[in-house]
Amino acid sequence: MELLTGLISSLTRAYAGTWEGTSPGRPAGRTFTPAQQADREREVDLLMEKSLPRIDRFRGLEESERARYAGRAHTALGKLLMDGPDPRVDRFFDQCEATGKEFVRRAREFDPSLSGSDIHQALRNQWVFNSVEVFLGGSVSLRPGSLAYSLMYPYTDNWLDATGHTVGEREEFQESLRRCLEGESEPGDTGTFPRLVRMIEEEFPRAGHPAVYDALLAILRAQGRSLRLQEPLEAADERTLESFTIEKGGASVAVDGMLVRGRLTPAELNPIFGYGVVLQFIDDLQDMDEDAAAGHSTMFTRACAAGPVDENSVDGNRGTSLFDRE
């Protein structure tokens, strides 16, 4: 446990250093002209026009079917936005679509009360798991561990993110999850979280795969620390905010890696952790307006309060945008 904890702490510091040391200018690499951007926008508009006649039918579907169709729409959009046809990418998206259909069926089988948005939230992690599978040289699949871990998101994140819970209630909830992940729940416990943990145990028995459970406990700890971000932070807490964000994002995808292999070398964990950091940044960027309205502190809400997040300077002064972290 200490080894993985130390690795995650080290990677958190390393990626924080990378973030802080990144130039505030635009990154090197390919750029797109306004004409190329307009072409892509037209292709997206065409896809939307083709989809409009199906909206009424979509609204009449059961929630599980709606989640499945939303997954197919994301697959189609992903293919469209890739830079030209690539058989490998097309194959990956097609395999993810097939996996998504089975995921929706099994999620509904596990809990018929899950909403379409809950299933889609869980499905997003399943696709992250699939991308890690391919990165590690495997094939796209749906496994008991990936299904269970993905379904933990709507059951835990949504409860912890909801307003109205006291600090004591949140701590008690976190403690109950910790005990379950450490194997302290009763064998006959029919609660949702114990059932999900048992699904992971069926694929990865505790005796032979301690790293899997160490990783799950690591994301639980990171999740608990990140609850501080639901309160406004003082300017002096910028580094704390940065550290919590990076740790939570990296640790979440580290679990996916462990569920692919059962264990990872430090060299394998490094890029997978970094992948999780990037996904966390994207998530926080997408949720920026919602988080700001709720009073949650993220790197993006803080930057937004200081000025436009997509500009390198405001009124000629550096230090007022997300891309300047000095």
Where in this protein do the model-derived segments appear?
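Intrinsically disordered, low-structural-confidence terminal and linker regions
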Residues: 1-37
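Charge-rich, solvent-exposed alpha-helical interaction surfaces
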Residues: 7-10, 14, 43, 47, ...
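Active-site/pore-lining binding-face segments in mid-to-C-terminal subdomains
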Residues: 267-326
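Amphipathic alpha-helical protein-interaction segments
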Residues: 36-52, 143-151, 155
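Short, compositionally biased low-complexity segments
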Residues: 18-23, 42-48, 67-70, 163-172, ...
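All-alpha helical catalytic cores of prenyl diphosphate-utilizing isoprenoid enzymes
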Residues: 86-154, 158-174, 180-292
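Surface-exposed polar/charged interaction patches
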Residues: 10-25, 50-61, 79, 83, ...
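Low-complexity, highly charged intrinsically disordered N-terminal segments
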Residues: 54-105
